[in-house]
């Protein structure tokens, strides 16, 4: 029997895609993309902080609650998020970078970081989040 506090659809409860308890920082300046990602991740049980539309807003949210993983748009309006990515990595937080375009070769700040090109599928994101759920980081 399912818990009355779990408002997710039955197919999302206890499945292989369960992200229950995962603390995610979402940094995305496109409100429609951020809303869709947040809604999907929360349906799978993740605790999503944000979305933050700027690096300053994301840094403030980080001080309130350090995430287990961060989904970060690389191009945020007129700024890039390389400084934020470096800060997250210094704290030991895995980062998944989302972007509509990547430079080739990747900037040094992105070396060793998971990078996904937008539009990104939910399956692609889950592929990288599920191992974090299992290990806790």
Whereabouts are the PLM-identified features?
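Conserved acidic carboxylate
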Residues: 28
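Active-site residues of response regulator receiver
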Residues: 73
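Alpha4 helix (beta4-alpha4-beta5 surface) of REC/receiver domains from two-component response regulators
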Residues: 83, 90, 101-118, 123, ...
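Acidic, metal-coordinating helix/loop segments flanking the phosphotransfer/catalytic sites
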Residues: 51-69
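Non-catalytic signal-transmission and effector/linker regions of two-component phosphorelay proteins
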Residues: 1-23, 56, 114-117, 121-137
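Hydrophobic/aromatic residues positioned on beta-strands within the core alpha/beta folds
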Residues: 96-99
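Acidic catalytic/metal-coordinating carboxylates
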Residues: 54, 80-83
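Two-component/phosphorelay signaling modules centered on CheY-like receiver
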Residues: 31-50
């Amino acid at each position: 029997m399912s818990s009355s506090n779990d408002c997710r659809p039955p197919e999302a409860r206890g499945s292989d895609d369960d992200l229950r308890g995962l603390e995610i920082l979402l940094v995305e300046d496109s409100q429609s993309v951020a809303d869709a990602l947040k809604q999907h991740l929360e349906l799978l049980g993740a605790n999503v902080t944000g979305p933050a539309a700027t690096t300053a807003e994301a840094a403030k949210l980080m001080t309130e609650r350090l995430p287990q993983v961060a989904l970060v748009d690389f191009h945020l309006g007129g700024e890039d998020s390389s400084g934020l990515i470096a800060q997250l990595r210094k704290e030991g937080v895995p980062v998944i970078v989302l972007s509509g375009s990547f430079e080739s070769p990747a900037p040094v700040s992105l070396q060793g970081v998971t990078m996904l090109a937008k539009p990104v599928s939910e399956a692609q994101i889950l592929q990288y989040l599920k191992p974090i759920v299992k290990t806790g980081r």
